[in-house]
Amino acid sequence: MTHLSPEAFAIIEGRHADPFRYLGQHNVDGQTIVRAFLPEASRVEVVGEHGEVAPLARIHDAGLFTGTMSSMQRYRLRATFGDSVTDLEDPYRFLPILGDFDLHLLGEGNHERLYDKLGAHPMVIDGVDGVGFVVLAPNARRVSVVGDFNFWNARRHPMRVRGNGYWELFIPRARAGDHYKFDIIGPQGEHLPLKSDPMAFAAEMRPKTASIVVDETRLPRPRPAPHDINKLNKPVSIYEVHLGSWRRKDNNQWLTYRELAEQLPAYARDMGFTHIEFLPINEHPFDGSWGYQPTGLYAPTSRFGSPEDFCALVDACHREGLAVWLDWVPGHFPDDPHGLGHFDGTALYEHANPMQGRHLDWGTLIYNYGRTEVANFLRSNALFWLERYGIDGLRVDAVASMLYLDYSRPSGGWIPNKYGGRENLEAIEFLRRTNIDVFGHFPQATTAAEESTAWPQVSRPVDTGGLGFGYKWNMGWMHDTLRYVSKDPIHRKYHHGEILFGLHYAFSENFILPLSHDEVVHGKRSILGRMPGDDWQRFANLRAYYSFMFGHPGKKLLFMGCELAQEREWNHDTSLDWHLLGDARYAGIQALIRDLNHLYRNQPALHERDCDPEGFEWLITDDADRNVFAWVRKGFDERAHCVVVVNFSPNVYYNYRVRAPLGGTWREVFNSDSSHYGGSNVGNVGQVHASEDQHLNLILPPMAAVFLVPEA
């Protein structure tokens, strides 16, 4: 056996940090030396580009071979495995994948298209098909690619490290569909659990965790959504959907992306929604997280199909005229051993100090936004979904937890910023930069913040001191109004201000009024379940509340099942209770939501100035004893008015006077007490004439809302 160098043993033992320095073709003292490590081969030859064939000597039983050629040239390896002989391309003869400019941008944290360079990409180099793998692991001693193409042998394909800690390797004959992971030796020489690719475009179905090679450049591009569908002056009515529980097959199995594409968009369109918002579809290991603890930010979950199948779902939504928003989770990630946590043996993506790096409420890890590579990874992910899948908007989850260093932490359990404050300065900069990038590259797209505090200017431009979001969820409106309608009507007069208060700040942000998944879980009951009174009152209350919501300034969001008046809380493990529609009470609520959506879309006054104080005027605020509110919504046209009157009491009020913004005849275009919705059919016989002193004398139905517009 030949005397071996320490480098040779490092290759054999799978711990060489720079395999290209030893393996492949080298000029040594005027000789062309070729070295290869093929553990399963009994014999290896090198075949030159002009036909030269030279044997390589086996210098170690582990499978290390070496020999000489006449000159430096392109070559391939001819290896004998048992009784078969195979020609192989040597990964260690190819030039680097990352260019100098890429490395420069990566070092700065300014590479806006990480998804073009990092991860696994089918490619052709020097006429050879294969896959290029690139991963960030700056503190690792050694990184190898393991997968279907090398029998998951970490010694077979060690990678080379480039500037700033990016490891890369081109593996010939690897192809789309191959499963792979990264085998990493940490800074102390410790072997880490096999890691999934942070940039993987697909992953195995849980509980398996391997990444899957995808040629995402070949993904079909969904047709675009309607132009300007996200604009402030357009109707935005969002149907929030959890794909795994919207509807299921008879055996309780999920619908696939393509099966959903056949049913969901057409349903949402028929119901009058303008947008569909999916709870996170990024790959995640735990069903019970609903997707909010993702391990694969660049991979649509394989639960429902392939990336191509998800493209088909987005395309079907766009075909029906619907915009598609995704819930996006850049705030935290789970600590599953195959994921981002302790990725290279150090706190790479997270903070090392648990007072900064771990969420106490959720047991998850917090991204280190101050690390340029991490912020770049997340910003690029936002752009990835908009470009590759044609997504129209991102709703950013748990923004408050990102903004505050002391979020849900005890006194002394957090670390102040450099000024001694509680604001997470790096997260603020990250959010602003992300919004600038999104709107800069995709002007038709938008972002929305789930932000539950009074942080100012969330949906105001960055250059005026804002965070730059397109919209903000109005959590205060949701809490106040749900608290009000859950009271017995006899007590509501003492809570009158809970309805009025929201209008004090309704135009301080571009608000979305959310009745989201969070409001129908964890013992809060369903929306219908919060309504007081007997059966008639509960349904009438719900009809009045939904009508109040659609007449109120702000864009709308309803979680799936709210339109069915689900009795039980949402359960992610089962389908919605579609059988309820066999009962006229529940079918009436569905019809109500359908008509409210179409009214909201077709009446400019109800949407054109949703975020503009000039589009709203109170008409009645002081009738607490009768639980009545009235206001007018105004569009840009001087006659685009809609008067909304809501009676949250069980009494009928006759000759109820409401000031009319315009004289003449007013049509009652909507009445939630219609028998069509399950109501008692009390109303105004279709129209009302304004009196000489410009008032409307109305009949107010019980627990109901009426909408009136001026006759054209």
Curated annotation (Swiss-Prot):
Keywords: Carbohydrate metabolism, Glycogen biosynthesis, Glycogen metabolism, Glycosyltransferase, Transferase. One of its GO terms (molecular function) is 1,4-alpha-glucan branching enzyme activity. The keyword Glycosyltransferase applies. It comes from the Bacteria. This is 1,4-alpha-glucan branching enzyme GlgB. SMART domains: Aamy. NCBIfam families: branching_enzym (TIGR01515), PRK05402.1 (NF003811), PRK12313.1 (NF008967). It comes from Bradyrhizobium sp. (strain ORS 278).
